[in-house]
Amino acid sequence: TVGEGRCNLSLGTSGTLFISSGKFGVDAHNALHSFDHADGGYHLMGCMLSAASCNKWWMDEILKTTEYAREQEKIKNLGENRVFFLPYLMGERSPHNDPDARAMFLGMSMDTTREDMTQAVLEGVAFGLRDSLEVARSLGIRIERSKICGGGAKSPLWKKILAAVLNLKLDLIESEEGPGYGGAILAAVGCGEYESVQAACEKLVHVVDTVEPEPVLVEKYEARYQEF
C-alpha cells in the first residue's frame, strides 16, 4: 500500500492501520506512530493490541466452539445491536496508549442473546480501529479505501461491518499473507527488479474482491460509533 492517502488494514491478532502519506504526521497526543521510509515518504500506523484475538477469545474460551462462520451466520440486524464490547483485553496501544485499559461488555439486558454478544465483539474491534482512523483524518489525511488482509479478513460479515464503520471501500488482495508478501516486494525493489516500491505494488498487488460500504449501514454505525 503506497501512495498518498492509501491505507492497509491488517486484521490479525492485533489490528493495524498502515496509512501512506507524503508528510510526517504527528498529533498532539502521539496517538499514532509515524515512520520515514528509506526511499522517501512516510507511513502512519495505528495499532490496537487485540483485534481478531478478541474474536478468538470469545469463540474459543467463552463459547467453546470453533464454528466461527456458523456463529456469525446467526447475526442479522447489523447496526441495531444495543450491546457494546470494549476490545481492550491486553490494554490498548493506538490511539489511547493505556496499558491499564480493560475489556468489557456494556448495555446487556434480559433480552441480550448469544448472537448480540458475538456481534458486539466484531463491532467493538471495528470501532477501535475507527478511533485510529479518526486521528489520521484529524491530521488532514483523506482516505477513501483500504486494502485488508489477515485472518479476520476471511469473514464476509466482519468485512461488511468494517466497511460501514470506517466508511471505506475494502479491497481484498490475492495473497492473504500481507507482511510476507510486502517483504518480498521490498526485496524485489532492492534487487533492482522494479524502480520503486510504488511501481512494484502496482504490478504485483492484485485486488480480487471489494467490499463497498452500504449507505444505510454507514448511517446506523455512525450513530453507534458516536455512542462508543
Residue ranges and their predicted role:
Residues 1-227:
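Active-site core segments that coordinate phosphate-bearing ligands/cofactors
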